[in-house]
Curated annotation (Swiss-Prot):
Keywords: ATP-binding, Cytoplasm, Kinase, Nucleotide-binding, Transferase. It catalyses: butanoate + ATP = butanoyl phosphate + ADP. PROSITE patterns: ACETATE_KINASE_1, ACETATE_KINASE_2. PANTHER family: ACETATE KINASE (PTHR21060), BUTYRATE KINASE 2-RELATED (PTHR21060:SF3). Its EC number is 2.7.2.7. InterPro entries: Aliphatic_acid_kin_short-chain, Aliphatic_acid_kinase_CS, ATPase_NBD, Butyrate_kin. It comes from Clostridium perfringens (strain SM101 / Type A). It is an enzyme of class 2 (transferase). One of its GO terms (molecular function) is ATP binding. The gene is buk. This is Probable butyrate kinase. One of its GO terms (biological process) is acetate metabolic process. Pfam families: Acetate_kinase (PF00871). One of its GO terms (cellular component) is cytoplasm.
Length: 356
């Protein structure tokens, strides 16, 4: 049976929705919200009714009867650290999404919106593999400063989806393989997946790992300390240097990897150096994750928007092909990944996890 699902993925100025029958997409819409509209609301949670109305209006216009849905799936938000999987939305989760226990983020509305619509039609609401998925081993959490433990914040939804896709295409299960998965987008995350769990990964938001189009990645801590206390920058300005204005933006004033690739291909000296450093840092992180997996790696999987570039993937492969074969799944399909997570539960392949 092909389940009919509504998928909701809220962003800061848009809400992406999809309607699926099984894994087949029958509708995809990006509902854009103007800055003026968003600014009317003091908090992200205050946008709930507005976003819900917009979603229901578009579904009606497109001839989608919500009463025919089997479930509603939302993008998971900044919850407490949880293990990966599909979670049924419950009151404890809704409360934590409302307050944003790990910070405010538009994705916090995903679970709440899905729950609101599912309640109206008497169906179940789910979230799948939010960014706060944390399966790190205790040994990976120590940083050298007890007050600053390493944290798991990464592209969990896409990393898990492509890892499961690899397993399926190779007639095995995610729980039976060891993979190094590299997501390359606005941020870069490199995860060590051992038998179905991401036992180590860089904090791709504001922690460590390779620099990326907009993020600094790991930086020298002594110099960062000097910068923080120099009196030249506010806390917000320093944070912007790490997230938003770091990486390619800082070095080349662009957040588009294609610009850097073009400069490198044309032999531009500065552009080539930045591009080579980007490849170098990703390859180095892959190498460290190979050590985490004791050298037992079935494959290195590259994904995210930048993985569409053969120039990038070939450059990485040149450095790491001695570790394991490389597989490339360019881009990311978050709506499909969310649908697949719900289908696994509805089909009885997995049990829905309970958020506490």
């Amino acid at each position: 049976m092909a389940y009919k699902l509504l998928i909701i993925n809220p962003g800061s100025t848009s809400t992406k929705i999809g309607v699926y029958e099984g894994e087949k997409e029958i509708l995809e819409e990006t509902l854009r919200h103007s800055a003026e509209e968003i600014l009317k609301y003091d908090t992200i949670f205050d946008q709930l009714d507005f976003r819900k109305e917009v979603i229901l209006k578009v579904l009606k216009e497109k001839g989608i009867d919500i009463n025919e849905l089997d479930a509603v799936v939302g993008r998971g938000g900044m919850l407490k650290p949880i293990e990966g999987g599909t979670y049924e939305v419950n009151e404890a989760m809704v409360e934590d999404l409302k307050i944003g226990v790990q910070g405010p983020h538009a994705s916090n509305l995903g679970g709440i919106l899905s729950n609101e619509i599912a309640k109206e039609i008497g169906k179940r609401a789910f979230i799948v593999d939010p960014v706060v998925v944390d399966e790190m081993e205790d040994v990976a959490r120590l940083s050298g400063v007890p007050e600053l433990p390493r944290k798991s914040k990464f592209h969990a939804l896409n990393q898990k989806a492509v890892a499961k896709r690899y397993a399926k295409e190779h007639n095995t299960s995610y729980e039976d393989v060891n993979l190094i998965v590299v997501h390359m987008g606005g941020g870069v995350s490199v995860g060590a997946h051992r038998k179905g769990r991401v036992i180590d990964v860089n904090n791709a938001l504001d922690g460590d790992g390779p620099f990326s189009p907009e993020r600094a990645g790991g930086v020298p801590s002594g110099e960062l300390l000097e910068m923080c206390f120099s009196g030249k920058y506010s806390k917000e300005e320093v944070y912007k240097k790490l997230v938003g204005k770091g990486g390619f933006v800082a070095y080349a004033n662009t957040n588009d990897a294609r610009d850097l690739i073009k400069l490198s291909q044309e032999g531009d000296e500065k552009g080539s150096l930045i591009f080579n450093a980007f490849i170098y840092q990703i390859a180095k992180e892959i190498g460290s994750m190979a050590v985490v997996l004791d050298g037992e790696v079935n494959a290195i999987v590259l994904t995210g928007g930048i993985a569409y570039s053969d120039y990038v993937t070939n450059a990485i492969n040149k450095k790491v092909k001695w570790i394991a074969p490389m597989v490339v799944y360019g881009g990311e399909d978050e709506l499909l990944a969310l649908a697949q997570g719900a289908i696994r539960v509805l089909d009885g392949v997995e049990e829905a996890k309970i958020y506490k």
